[in-house]
């Protein structure tokens, strides 16, 4: 991500830290980009999405096509994970976060897709545990599980 963003200007990445939410602990990395030239928020989105957390590496058309195909097969909403944010009054500063969650409503049903990022050093049993914990936390938040 920082490599991609460096095409836009000077990138500063703070140390990864833990972010505690109700029931889950997430890793958080704050990244600041001092743009080389003025850009609007919409032009920044392709640099932010999809990240390796919800996307693929290498990030080329072939792997993105494969990712889209897998998501269709698994019935994952196409908007699962995306940049989210706001522009400060005056338009000089934009705050964006890369959201890796989603919710899709269809009739009287709701889909809450979840996943985990698999990389070379991943331990599959840890990834399954993380996935289970994520799903349970969301179910508790919605009052569907105690």
Task: Name each region found by the language model.
Residues 55-146:
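Glycine-rich, small/acidic residue-mixed loop/short-helix segments
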Residues 1-70, 143:
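Contiguous alpha-helical scaffold segments within structured protein domains
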């Amino acid at each position: 991500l920082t490599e991609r963003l460096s095409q836009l200007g000077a990138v500063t990445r703070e140390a990864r830290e833990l972010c505690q939410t109700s029931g889950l602990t997430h890793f958080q990395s704050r990244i600041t980009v001092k743009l080389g030239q003025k850009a609007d928020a919409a032009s920044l989105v392709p640099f932010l999405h999809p990240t390796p957390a919800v996307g693929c590496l290498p990030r080329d058309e072939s792997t993105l096509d494969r990712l889209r195909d897998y998501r269709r097969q698994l019935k994952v909403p196409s908007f699962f994970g995306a940049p989210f944010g706001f522009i400060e009054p005056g338009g000089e500063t934009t705050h964006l976060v890369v959201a890796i969650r989603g919710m899709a409503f269809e009739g009287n049903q709701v889909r809450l897709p979840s996943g985990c990022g698999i990389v070379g050093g991943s331990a599959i049993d840890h990834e399954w545990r993380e996935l289970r914990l994520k799903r349970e936390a969301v179910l508790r938040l919605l009052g569907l599980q105690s």
